[in-house]
Amino acid sequence: MKKTLFMLCLSFIAVLGAMGQTADADRIIGTYMTEGGKAKVVIDKKGDTYNGKLIWNMTEGLLDKNNPVKSEQTKPLVGKTILRGFKYAKKDTWDGGKIYDPENGKTYSCKITLKNNGDLTVRGFIGVSLLGRNTTWK
């Protein structure tokens, strides 16, 4: 009886911990304005990964002209997924994803950090995160 009660309590604690981690991980979900106010990106969750789609661009009708895939160059930037495959890593940090830069058509490894004020620090990099640059999304 004691063993059953102990296992039940242990299972309950594990479920509560997992629920708390999911709530923390989902804090990134929302709409953000990119640095300089050029575009808006909405981040959502699909399965266990977080992705971001461009939903507004300051220049209406802008096409993905720098995309290395020829067939994508005539498609509009609005509606394009530019953040892909992020997973919650630790407190206020999501990594393991990629960011597409429509200004040069390149895709980079990326890490996202949620600041206390709700802004995101988005760091795109090649190889290791030391070799990259930050941008702040509000």
Task: Label the predicted regions.
Residues 1-4:
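Positively charged n-region of N-terminal signal peptides that target proteins for export
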Residues 7-15:
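Bacterial N-terminal signal peptides
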Residues 20-31:
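N-terminal helix-cap/turn-to-beta initiation motif at the start of protein domains
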Residues 29, 35-103, 107-109:
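Central antiparallel beta-sheet cores of small beta-barrel/beta-sandwich binding domains
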Residues 33-34, 129:
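Structural recognition of beta-strand segments within beta-rich domains
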Residues 46, 115-116:
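Structural motif
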Residues 102, 113, 126-128:
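Short polar/acidic secondary-structure junctions
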Residues 119, 125-138:
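Edge beta-strand at a domain terminus
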